[in-house]
């Protein structure tokens, strides 16, 4: 453990992001207290905040890199040892009454994301915290108030079995508070009383419902475990991600009106799945189970949040979903939250917050500058992944089947494989297999798109010139013109529609 920093850090939220923040602070010698609204998250009876039992998440480079900075190799090995490597998408469909599937690799170099158990990840982080002497965990504590000028906060000590009497309240002091308490953050609510926060909340026109594909009778996976399975529809989609117990956790994403249609009768649900998600029912989920799961599991909205700034003075900062809830279509919500912690503590380190020779007043000023730097750096990147995640919903439910998507993916992967010095990569690779800032990812992808467009136009002009020369010099072979005209027109139409 590092020498005591004489900082007291209070973290609200003991989920993965809050737990990682506690490990970072503890490693720097801070006195850390973690307060969690729910009971001990390692207790199976603890109810998730979204009231579902969903256990799957996509853990990729950003999240793994952030955890590696804790230098707790055993913890990381424990987490990844239970994860399932996912190398790409498996697109499902049906033509002429025949089922088909097509694999789309994420990366030409064979890299993969990890389908990880959310509970297993959170438990591993909490176990590490419990073994860290300068960390205290407080479950069943609800944040009820905060004074970020006086650096005080108040929590109710809740007793799960007692819902009648008023919970006793405790007052605590801190040097700074980290709000990691999710999209409906109480920390953010209280911080907004002090900081002039621009806040934007959006519910997209989509609901989600969880389904479950069980293992076979022999205890094996029913479909490939190393893919994210997608049944795309133009306005909706059904996906499946593998779990360690050989089952799949599935999600139906669709508009409110589509859910209303499915709710109208049992026949509507079965007919819709047979038409739009071929091979799911009855092959993977029985009709009875499909109906039961649809009626039993909640139909939940998807929330997207942007706000700024992420801090107040030297005493408060929000991270993860509390700062930037994103829709789940890039699998980056948790990864972005974990990356927040790496960026936050890099800013604290760079501004000399942990200089033990500095006075408390000087360190407070340094911390204020560090939190401002964190806001400046992270806001643009969080807004970028927010936008990318929304756009990826369109790609997953529709774009993966378009010729343009396949053409651009093929071109970019070819350049990445055979001319790596150009630094050419697909958007997915930049997001999932690097730590390139999200805002820079958007700029790089736009630049690549522009170059590909100009390259295509040049190819069209060159082809037209060649055809013209041939037609002039070899009139008897003018049929070559009509032979090339159609594909040239198609290529131009695809690029024009894509960029308009």
Swiss-Prot record:
**UniProt pathway:** Secondary metabolite biosynthesis; Cofactor biosynthesis; NAD(+) biosynthesis; quinolinate from L-kynurenine: step 1/3
EC number, as in UniProt: 1.14.13.9
Residue sites binding FAD per the record: 17, 36-38, 58, 118, 143, 321, 332-335
Biological process GO annotation list?
'de novo' NAD biosynthetic process from L-tryptophan; anthranilate metabolic process; kynurenine metabolic process; L-tryptophan catabolic process; quinolinate biosynthetic process
Bilayer-crossing regions: 451-471
Matches recorded under PANTHER family: KYNURENINE 3-MONOOXYGENASE (PTHR46028:SF2)
Q: In the UniProt record, does the keyword RNA-binding occur?
A: no
Establish whether keyword RNA-binding is in the entry: no
Q: What does this protein do?
A: Indoleamine 2,3-dioxygenase; part of the gene cluster that mediates the biosynthesis of aspcandine, a pyrrolobenzazepine alkaloid. Initially, the indoleamine 2,3-dioxygenase acdA accepts L-tryptophan and performs the oxidative opening of the indole ring to yield N'-formyl-L-kynurenine, which undergoes the spontaneous deformylation reaction to provide L-kynurenine. The kynurenine 3-monooxygenase acdD then hydroxylates L-kynurenine to afford 3-hydroxy-L-kynurenine. 3-hydroxy-L-kynurenine is activated by the A domain of the NRPS-PKS acdB and subsequently loaded onto the enzyme.
Where does it mainly reside? mitochondrion
> Can you say what this protein is called?
Kynurenine 3-monooxygenase acdD
Location in the cell reads: Mitochondrion outer membrane
Which residues bind L-kynurenine per the record? 89, 106, 392, 428
Q: Which reaction does it catalyse?
A: L-kynurenine + NADPH + O2 + H(+) = 3-hydroxy-L-kynurenine + NADP(+) + H2O
Query: Which GO cellular component does the record give, naming just one?
Result: mitochondrial outer membrane
Glycosylation sites noted in the Swiss-Prot or TrEMBL record? 50, 163
Q: Which organism encodes this protein?
A: Aspergillus candidus
Its keywords, alphabetically, are:
FAD, Flavoprotein, Glycoprotein, Membrane, Mitochondrion, Mitochondrion outer membrane, Monooxygenase, NADP, Oxidoreductase, Pyridine nucleotide biosynthesis, Transmembrane, Transmembrane helix
């Amino acid at each position: 453990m590092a020498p005591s920093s004489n900082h007291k850090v209070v973290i609200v939220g003991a989920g993965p992001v809050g737990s990682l923040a506690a490990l970072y602070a503890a490693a720097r010698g801070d006195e850390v207290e973690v307060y969690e609204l729910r009971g001990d998250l390692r207790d199976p009876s603890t109810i998730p905040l979204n009231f579902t039992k969903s256990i799957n998440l996509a853990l990729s480079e950003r999240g793994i890199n952030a955890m590696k900075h804790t230098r707790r190799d055993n913890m990381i090995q424990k987490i990844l040892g239970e994860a399932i490597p996912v190398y790409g998408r498996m697109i499902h469909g049906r033509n002429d009454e025949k089922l088909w599937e097509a694999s789309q690799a994420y990366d030409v170099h064979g890299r993969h994301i990890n389908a990880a158990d959310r509970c297993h990840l959170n438990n591993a982080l909490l176990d590490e915290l419990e073994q860290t002497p300068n960390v205290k965990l407080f479950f069943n504590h609800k944040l009820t108030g905060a004074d970020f000028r006086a650096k005080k906060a108040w929590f109710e000590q809740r007793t799960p079995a007692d819902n009648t009497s008023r919970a006793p309240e405790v007052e605590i002091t801190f040097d700074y508070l980290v709000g990691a308490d999710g999209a409906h953050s109480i920390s953010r609510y209280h911080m907004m009383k002090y900081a002039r926060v621009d806040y934007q909340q959006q519910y997209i026109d989509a609901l989600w419902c969880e389904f479950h594909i069980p293992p076979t009778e022999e205890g094996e996976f029913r479909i490939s475990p190393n893919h994210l399975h997608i049944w795309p529809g133009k306005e909706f989609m059904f996906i499946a991600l593998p779990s360690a117990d050989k089952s799949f956790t599935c999600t139906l994403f669709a508009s409110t009106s589509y859910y209303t249609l499915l709710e109208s009768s049992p026949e509507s649900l079965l007919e819709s799945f047979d038409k739009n998600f071929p091979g799911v029912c009855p092959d993977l989920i029985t009709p009875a189970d499909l109906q039961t799961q649809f009626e039993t599991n909640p139909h939940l909205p998807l929330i997207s949040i942007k706000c700024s700034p992420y801090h107040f003075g030297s005493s408060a900062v929000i991270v993860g979903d509390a700062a930037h809830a994103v829709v789940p279509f890039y699998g980056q919500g948790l990864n972005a939250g974990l990356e927040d912690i790496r960026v936050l503590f890099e800013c604290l380190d760079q501004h000399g917050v942990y200089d033990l020779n500095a006075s408390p007043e000087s360190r407070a000023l340094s911390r204020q500058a560090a939190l401002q730097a964190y806001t400046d750096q992270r806001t643009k990147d969080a807004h970028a992944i927010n936008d990318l995640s929304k756009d990826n919903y369109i790609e997953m439910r529709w774009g993966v089947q378009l010729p343009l998507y396949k053409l651009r993916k093929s071109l970019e992967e070819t350049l990445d494989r055979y001319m790596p010095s150009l630094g050419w990569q697909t958007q997915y690779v930049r997001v999932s297999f690097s730590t390139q800032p999200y805002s820079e990812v958007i700029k790089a992808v736009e630049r690549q798109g522009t170059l590909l467009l100009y390259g295509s136009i040049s190819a069209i002009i060159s082809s037209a010139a060649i055809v013209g020369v041939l037609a002039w010099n070899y009139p008897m072979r003018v049929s070559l013109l009509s032979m090339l005209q159609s594909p040239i027109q198609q290529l131009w139409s695809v690029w024009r529609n894509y960029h308009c």
